[in-house]
Amino acid sequence: MDFKNLQYESLSYIICNLQKNFKLYCEKCLKPYKLTNGLYFYLIYINKNRNCSLNDVSTEFEVDKAHTTRTISRLEQDGYIEKIQNPNDSRAFQLRVTDKGEEVLGDIKNIFSKWDNHIKKEFSDTEYKELVKNLHVVKDIKTAVEEE
């Protein structure tokens, strides 16, 4: 591949730029909530996996437990999640999103929708659905590439 045309021919390059643009957009929109890009993914995961454990979160995001503990502590400090002692294991905690966290998740959903709607304007409904379908295929290739 010719590096002069990388920005036009490389899907990897395009995805990196898309990610950068989305990250900057989210940073701006989420600044009032003191949420970084990394933090809102944790909040979304905990919301989808009510009563998950710190180990579950570490496994999902492929990070060490110390990193997860720091991240969860920050979300708890800001009032977005709460740690509840696991009734089956007094040494473990279950994680839940608080009412404040639910409100922020609603705002995050709106932020995502606004971004999506901006992109949708460039495509017909059929083209947009096809784009999303194809991007899911690309996303799922990750596992196959890691196994090579």
UniProtKB/Swiss-Prot annotation:
Q: Which residues bind DNA?
A: 54-77
Q: Where is the HTH marR-type domain?
A: 1-140
Q: Name one GO molecular function term.
A: DNA-binding transcription factor activity
Keyword set, alphabetical order: DNA-binding, Transcription, Transcription regulation
- Superkingdom, natural source: Bacteria
Q: Which InterPro entries match?
A: BilQ, HTH_MarR-typ, WH-like_DNA-bd_sf, WH_DNA-bd_sf
Q: Does the keyword DNA-binding apply?
A: yes
SMART domains listed in its UniProt record: HTH_MARR (SM00347)
Q: Does the keyword ATP-binding apply?
A: no
What is the purpose of this protein? Transcription regulator that regulates expression of the bilirubin reductase operon (bilQ, bilR and bilS).
Official protein name in the record: HTH-type transcriptional regulator BilQ
